[in-house]
Regions:
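Beta-propeller-forming repeat regions
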Residues: 1-422
Length: 422
């Protein structure tokens, strides 16, 4: 059975002028005002650092609604900001449980909880370490009714776990990768932590580590990959792509890549059992946007290669992610952007066929912006955001209740990880 999708032209729903936010911003999406629509938070990083070794802080944040109205700004956009070479320490999440989202960020060497509606500071805390601001991970380590603990980390070596009062719970040193993923594997109401190649319990105790893997973990995904499994498994992309069970047994490894820079899980094919794993192989590291070479590949649930892209254009910095509910096909797709070589952001199906190509280049954010049940895609550059959908939808309708922030939306990272728990 061939379930390839029909290619459609994306519908432009709106354009937003982002110039007031400054250059080199990353976009975060969340309902900041509580009106049932996602808003846009543009975050500019600090400059003057080498982000291969030193983590970013926030220089400025600028919030817009999805019609382009400026909501608030904190900090002053710099004419010489840092670049997007690593994560920015920001998340949008209702950390205090009052029904409205806050913005969590590290700015001016401190951790801030900011009112999403106004941009005003609600709380401020001292960092546990001067370098503990590479990213922000929201977790449930203490058995609360909802996640309200925080994990901070430096670039590659140490992480710090704190409770909702910002009291230190524990710290861990190891090969912690880029963005640790938290998940309650054993069902005790507390999250375990996959910190790079190290698997920790909720108290920070090392239970096991991946073996014979080089470099560091770039992306981590959780899901029941194999159809016969009763338990969630871990897909880790690093020097190679591996599948582990949550107790530390390696199930398979895929050695057909040079550098497995990104992985993502999804039901990309209906003719194959279990889930499929899309990956991005960084084949030749380049020195600019459009030299070097990378390629997308797809694996089945047992780690066997289904196909691998043979790019004829340059480009080595592609980011891929799973996008669900773009249309009514019932299948997931692979969204690829930052491709280089004049290749525009594109949605692919599980047969490597193009579902949609966006007519502008840039970074990409996507979410269900108004609770419609469908995802919209925002492509943005230094000055403009373009909002696209598979078909027209009215984005102007306010609702009486706030739009909740799901885990994917409060776990934003340059190295997309995730969980597939449908």
């Amino acid at each position: 059975m061939n379930d390839t999708a029909e290619q459609t032209k994306p519908v432009l729903l709106g354009k937003i002028d982002l110039s007031k936010a400054g250059r080199n911003c990353k976009m975060y999406l969340g309902d900041l005002t509580g009106n049932g629509r996602k808003d846009l938070l543009l975050v500019q990083p600090d400059g003057g650092i080498d982000d291969r070794y030193i983590p970013h802080q926030v220089e400025a944040m600028t919030a817009f609604d999805i019609e382009g109205n400026l909501l608030w700004q904190t900090g002053t956009p710099s004419d010489d900001p840092g670049g997007p070479g690593s994560d920015y320490p920001v998340q949008i999440y209702d950390i205090d449980g009052d029904g409205y989202n806050e913005v969590l960020c590290v700015m001016d060497k401190a951790f801030f909880i900011i009112d999403g509606k106004t941009g005003e500071v609600k709380k401020q805390y001292e960092l546990p370490n001067e370098f503990a601001h590479d990213c922000i991970v929201i977790a449930n380590l203490t058995g609360n009714s909802y996640p309200r603990d925080i994990i901070l980390k430096d670039r590659y070596h140490q992480l710090w776990a704190l409770n909702h009062k910002f009291e230190l719970l524990w710290t861990h040193k190891g090969n912690v990768g880029h963005f640790p993923w938290v998940f309650d594997f054993n069902g005790d109401g507390r999250d375990e932590v996959m910190a790079g190649y190290d698997f920790l319990n909720a108290d920070g105790q090392l239970l096991w580590s991946c073996s014979e893997l080089d470099d560091h973990a770039d992306c981590i995904w959780v899901g029941k990959v194999q159809q016969q499994t009763e338990h969630n498994q871990l897909v880790i992309g690093g020097s190679v792509t591996v599948l582990y069970d949550w107790k530390g047994e390696e199930i398979w490894r895929y050695n057909g890549s040079i550098e497995s820079q990104h992985v993502c899980l999804g039901k990309f094919r209906s003719d194959l059992p279990g889930l499929q794993i899309a990956g991005l192989d960084r084949i030749i590291r380049g020195t600019s946007y459009s030299d070097g070479r990378d390629g997308i590949f797809l694996l089945d649930a047992d780690g066997q290669e289904i196909w691998k892209e043979n790019r004829e254009t340059g480009g080595w910095l592609t980011i891929i992610d799973t996008i669900s509910d773009w249309d009514d096909s019932g299948l997931d797709y692979i969204l690829a952007y930052r491709r280089g070589g004049n290749v525009l952001p594109t949605i692919y199906d599980g047969y490597q066929q193009v579902v949609a190509t966006f007519p502008v280049d840039g970074y990409v954010s996507f979410d269900d912006l108004v609770g419609s049940g469908r995802k919209q895609v925002i492509v943005y550059d230094q000055t403009t955001a373009y909002i696209y959908a598979n078909e027209f939808i009215d984005l102007s309708q306010n609702k009486l209740t706030a739009l909740p922030q799901d885990k994917r939306s409060y776990s934003v990272t340059l190295y997309p990880g995730g969980e597939y728990v449908k």
